[in-house]
Amino acid sequence: MNMETKNGSPVPAGDYSGERDSADITEHEQMDVKPKTNGDSKADRKAANAKDPSRPRRKKARRACFACQRAHLTCGDERPCQRCIKRGLQDACHDGVRKKAKYLHDAPDGALMPAVSSNTNLYNNTLRNNLPISRNGTNAVNSNQQHSQQHPQQPTNPTNNNFYPTPQTQTGSYNPYQESSMGQSPFTTQSPVSPTFNMKSSTNGRNPSLSSTVNQQPTPSTALSGDTSQSQNPFAGPFFDPSDPALFNFDLSSMNFENRYGALEFGMLGHMATGAAGDSPTDSAGQRGSIGRSGSAQFSTPAPGFGESPGNQPFMFGDPLLNEWSAGPASGQHVNVGGVYAPNTMLPEHMKANAPHAFAIESGPASFTSPGSAPSPNIPTAAFDDGPFNNIAPAPKSNSLVPNGQRQVTASILKHPNLQVGPKRRHRNPSSIYESVKEPYAYTSGFHNLTAFIQRRFTPQKTVRIAKALASIRPSFIATTKTLNRDDLIFMEKCFQRTLWEYEDFINACGTPTIVCRRTGEIAAVGKEFSILTGWKKDVLLGKETNLNVNTGGSAVPQSGTTSRGSFTPRGSTLENSGTGRPQPVFLAELLDDDSVVEFYEDFARLAFGDSRGSVMTRCKLLKYKTKEDMEVAQSDDNGKWNNHLRKGGIAGEAGMNQLGFKDGKVDCAYCWTVKRDVFDIPMLIVMNFLPCI
């Protein structure tokens, strides 16, 4: 099967042998020679010389026809080309098929056609003569009489090949390919109306029906067609033809693309970007007869003679709202959304300020303020009083009806008409950290309190192990802090508070039980999941409430040589750290059992000044918060019944999670922690994540 049979074009056999025969070469040379005149024969021979620089050069075609491509001869932009006409092959003259690039291998053949600029004259001539255009740019009906005499024209099915229907030449029609000589402004581009649809007046003198009622949108099958039979049949014509550049008003000739595939891809990206604010053209766009991107008509009366009005402004990328952005409408101007949004879709007042605080590309801002700049009673705005644009008055709120019975809404609430948004959380301002921190943190007092607590709770053997671990990093602490003055220590505390400010959002967003403590082991931040798991309240951990915990993970009977934690008087917020006047937070050693505390400080000694990005993953036992009353309940028989029920039914919700380790007061967990350092390379805080082992 040869190439002619594949393309479906009837070509006489033997015309394209693939070799440059003498007839083709002679014909090619004769086409390059000027028409002979009555001048001297020497001048004719001089003009026939191919190496003569004065010989006129023919402009190379953008794409050769199939016959010229096979013969490797120069072709022209017209179809049929002169060579095919001379050889009587004008009916079979069509564009040749180029070899696809690798990145276009999956692209359809129709999308790789040359850009519109190469066939602009052909489109103009065809539309003026009301001749349909086939997909490859050739006329489906040959208007040349001599061509039809040589070869009979084959009938063409208009349903299959008429991809660009020609608008009817009536008063209300619009030719998208009008030339500037017809009274059109040279800066006016295509109308938003796609030439795929016929803009013609009906026979009874009424305007073409774009919508059945004011509040009812027509389906895409009835869009912009005055023909009753076509409007009733949703499949009468192709609504979306990817090869039609006017469907989305893409000016392919100005994009400098060699094929439609890349130009349409680039244009579609721009179309998607400009459609970020929704399909809501204004009244001026309705007077021009624009249609929405969804294909549904939004206005009932198109204006006749598009592009001929002296007040008509050019459309940027076929979007009238882009022009109104550059035109700068007055402040407080409302956008009439036409039939796209029903009159009863007005948002409540609290929704206006909670709308997205950003400009879409096509929503023309009246000023540089946010569309939702109206103050909300739920959001304190005291922290933003110094803004440079706060003196600009917000757009007036209007609930009045426009003359056509449709409600006006502002551009900030067009995107989500039925969205329910709760009151916003106030944005925290980190500037208060730098203003509130005036004194350095007393780490020396914190280490002294930690040492006293360890001596009271642990046995001498375990106390020695913890002391050795802390003593191994003591020289490093002295070396890094001996050159720091008071201002450096204040700056260190500001860095800690600023980092903790960031971790608070992380803790609230993460569902894992998390705590953050200082290098002394004092708790600085805690998540609610940790409180659910262990029973320790946040205020108790931060030292804001009295600590009544009596659970130390061991026996209440005092051991020999040391004092048990059970005999230690619980301390509260009234017991303040000496010299600082601040409440004492809970230490990390109070949350772990004895073995876990010893193991933690031995790992901390290796990681504090070691690997700055290292972490430790191991298992531990968390101590639940228990008062004396809780300890008595834990020893009762009712708790044994609860543990049996827990083993049978499993853990469900917060109640089941809170009951983990209720009997013995310990929760077996796997935890991961890391050390974060400050700008002086000193351990600043410890971040720990826990997961219970079920």
From Swiss-Prot:
Compartment list: Nucleus
One example of a Gene Ontology biological process annotation: cellular response to starvation
Gene Ontology molecular function terms on file: DNA-binding transcription factor activity, RNA polymerase II-specific; RNA polymerase II transcription regulatory region sequence-specific DNA binding; zinc ion binding
Transit peptide is among the record's keywords: no
GO cellular component: nucleus
Residue span of region Disordered: 1-61, 126-240, 276-300, 552-582
Keywords, sorted A to Z: Activator, DNA-binding, Gluconeogenesis, Metal-binding, Nucleus, Transcription, Transcription regulation, Zinc
Family statement drawn from the similarity comment of this UniProt entry: Belongs to the ERT1/acuK family.
Function statement: Transcription factor which regulates nonfermentable carbon utilization. Activator of gluconeogenetic genes.
Protein name per Swiss-Prot or TrEMBL: Transcription activator of gluconeogenesis Pc22g08580
Biological classification of the source: Eukaryota, Fungi, Dikarya, Ascomycota, Pezizomycotina
